[in-house]
Amino acid sequence: MHIVLASTSRYRQEIIARLGLPFCAEPPVCDETPLPGETALETAVRLARVKAQSLAGKHPEALIIGSDQVALLDDKQIGKPGGFEQGVEMLKWMSGRTVVFHSALALYNTASGRLQECVGITRVTLRRLTEAQIRNYLTREPDALHCAGSAKSEGLGGALLEKVESDDPNALIGVPLFQLITMLGNEGVEVLK
C-alpha cells in the first residue's frame, strides 16, 4: 500500500522523507475556513481529516496523511495572513507572547476505511519584536506568509522564538512525527524495518 501526503508544503514533505519510506505528495481539496463556533483544536482535526479523505478517490489502496495546524492566542484562531501587512499585524500582536499551536494529523487507510487522528500541542513564546524586525523577517522569509501567524520555526524564523514547549519538535512544523510513526505501525508499516 503506498503512502500519500495530502500537502504541498516542502517542510512537511521533508519531515515525512526523514522516515525513509517512499511516498508521493499531492495538494488536498479543502476549504480551510473555520466553522462557526469551532475551537482551534476542532478546526485542526477536521481539516486534517478532510485533507486526507479528499484524495481517497484518486488513491483507493493507500495510506493518506492529512495535516493541519491552527494557532491560538487570546482564544482567537490565528490563520495564514492574507498578505504582507496582515503578516506584520499578526506578528506585532504575537510579539512577546505565548501562542499555542494545534498540529493535527489524520492517517486514512482508503482500502479499509480506517481513520486515525492525533494532535500535537506546541507552546511557542515569541521574543519581543520591533516592527522593523518583523518587516525585515517577512521580507527575508516570504514563505512565512503561508504559515499560521506568519511564524515559522525553520530558517530565519528561529530568530522570532524565545521558547518552545512540545512533546514532539516536529509538531511545530505541522507533522507530529512521533505519533505518525505509531499510526503507520498500526497499519503494518514498520519504519525501522
From Swiss-Prot:
Primary localisation category: cytoplasm
Compartment(s) where it occurs, according to its Swiss-Prot or TrEMBL record: Cytoplasm
Gene Ontology cellular-component terms listed: cytoplasm
CDD domains the UniProt entry points to: Maf
Keyword terms: Cytoplasm, Hydrolase, Nucleotide metabolism
Top EC class of this enzyme: hydrolase
Cofactor(s), by name: a divalent metal cation
Site (Important for substrate specificity): Y11, Q69, E154
Pfam assignment, any one: Maf
MF term (GO), any: nucleoside triphosphate diphosphatase activity
Biological process (GO), any one: nucleotide metabolic process
Reactions this protein catalyses: N(7)-methyl-GTP + H2O = N(7)-methyl-GMP + diphosphate + H(+)
Protein family: Belongs to the Maf family. YceF subfamily.
This protein's name: 7-methyl-GTP pyrophosphatase
Taxon lineage: Bacteria, Pseudomonadati, Pseudomonadota, Betaproteobacteria, Neisseriales
